[in-house]
Amino acid sequence: MLPLVLNPVNLKVGLAGRGPARDRRAALLAEAGVEARLLPEPVPDDLLAALQVLFVAGLPEGEARDLATRARALGVLVNVEDVLPLCDFHVPAILRRGDLLLTASTGGQVPGLARALRESLAEQFGPEWTVRLKELGAARAKWRSEGLSPGEVSQHVRELMVRMGWL
C-alpha cells in the first residue's frame, strides 16, 4: 500500500450505495472535506466517467462488483467497503486533531486492529494537539522566514516539542 493524503478541493468523488453503510461513508467523506456526489441507481456511465474516485457502500457484492468493473474501465479508482478484492485503495482508521491527521491501516486485513490503534493514538494525542500544531506551524514559518535550512528548522521543531514536554 502507498499512503497518500489527497487535497479534496479538486477531487471528483462519487458515492454509490444504500442505507446506513452509505450514510456512514458520506459522513466520513464530509468530515474530510470531500464533496462527494451521491450517485443515483442505476449509475449511468457518463456520471462514472466524470469521477476520479468512487466509493461504494451498502450494495450487494454482485452489484458492487459490476459497478466497480464499469468504473475501473473508465479510469476511476474504486473502494468497495469491506470487499477487499474490489478495492483499488483502502481508507485507514482516522484520528483528526485539527490539521493533524493520524491514521492506522492493516491494508484492509484487520479493520478492528486499525480501529484499536486509532483509539490508542487518541489517548496519546488529545484535543490539545490542535493548538500545538498551530503553535509549531507558526514557529516553523518564523524559522523558515529567518532563512534557516530545512534541517535546522526540523531540529528546532524537535527541540521545541521536547522543551514543551509534548513528546
Question: Language-model segments: which ranges?
Answer:
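An accessory alpha-helical subdomain
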Residues: 108-167
